[in-house]
Amino acid sequence: MLINDVNKVKVGNIVFGGKKRFVLIAGPCVMESQELMDEVAGGIKEICDRLGIEYIFKASFDKANRSSIYSYRGPGLEEGMKMLTKIKEKFNVPVITDVHEAWQCKEVAKVADILQIPAFLCRQTDLLIAAAETGKAVNIKKGQFLAPWDMKNIVVKMEESRNKNIMLCERGSTFGYNNMVVDMRSLLEMRKFNYPVIFDVTHSVQKPGGLGTATSGDREYVYPLLRAGLAIGVDAIFAEVHPNPAEAKSDGPNMLYLKDLEEILKIAIEIDKIVKGV
């Protein structure tokens, strides 16, 4: 079980790692509008406050790896940072967003409490170094093409850049064409590096390029995977949430409905209690 102690990572008043309740990182896939972000952040925070779950808001200012050049990418860095700032100020929550190029790290770190390295870019040394040098916590998503033990080299890149505020995230592995699976052993293997482990339960059910010009997914598998990850004892759950996934501008097929989140989290808490005894 993943309840052994690890290097704890502190983000504001939130601590990742150790024998404590999981942290929730959740929000829409991409920044669609300030109104949508407010609705999601406010709704999730209310739920988490009721249930006693520590919450971090997530959203991307640029989806730089969309399947089609015609797909919506987001508002861009400058506008995106303004939108995240409003979320922080209005709801008093930490925020996380992804960076795609080294030059973005310094600017994003002025607003974001956690920088995220996308799975496709997890081996990009210059990007990792730039993120590490901000001194902020960094969530590194394991590439769909990597074995979990290959993440050790990525951890060393961060450590050698004098940043140990590291979190590692499982988001599924490529399984043939247009499909992904989750090897639950990855959660155990990555925990051996002595850093908190996050389970991205919504991207793990994607079917990359499954719609030809967009990614599809199987939302029905999010729930059992979530329960399985918590049974292992992960430090945090990462999930994309939307009021109406069918109308989402990115990743709709694998996103959770905001209206369903509270009941899902109630079950999650019970599993977490059994596993961690907290």
UniProtKB/Swiss-Prot annotation:
GO biological process: keto-3-deoxy-D-manno-octulosonic acid biosynthetic process; monosaccharide biosynthetic process
SUPFAM superfamilies tied to this protein: Aldolase (SSF51569)
Family: Belongs to the KdsA family.
Stated name of the protein: 2-dehydro-3-deoxyphosphooctonate aldolase
Organism expressing this protein natively: Fusobacterium nucleatum subsp. nucleatum (strain ATCC 25586 / DSM 15643 / BCRC 10681 / CIP 101130 / JCM 8532 / KCTC 2640 / LMG 13131 / VPI 4355)
Any one Gene Ontology cellular component term annotated for this protein: cytosol
Coiled coil: none
InterPro entries cross-referenced by the UniProt entry: Aldolase_TIM, DAHP1/KDSA, KDO8P_synthase
Enzyme Commission numbers on file: 2.5.1.55
PANTHER family, A to Z: PHOSPHO-2-DEHYDRO-3-DEOXYHEPTONATE ALDOLASE (PTHR21057)
Lineage: Bacteria, Fusobacteriati, Fusobacteriota, Fusobacteriia, Fusobacteriales
Any single Pfam family the record assigns to this protein: DAHP_synth_1
Catalytic reaction(s) noted: D-arabinose 5-phosphate + phosphoenolpyruvate + H2O = 3-deoxy-alpha-D-manno-2-octulosonate-8-phosphate + phosphate
Keywords of this entry: Cytoplasm, Lipopolysaccharide biosynthesis, Transferase
The protein's annotated pathway: Carbohydrate biosynthesis; 3-deoxy-D-manno-octulosonate biosynthesis; 3-deoxy-D-manno-octulosonate from D-ribulose 5-phosphate: step 2/3; Bacterial outer membrane biogenesis; lipopolysaccharide biosynthesis
Main location: cytoplasm
Intracellular or extracellular location(s): Cytoplasm
Superkingdom field: Bacteria
GO MF term list: 3-deoxy-8-phosphooctulonate synthase activity
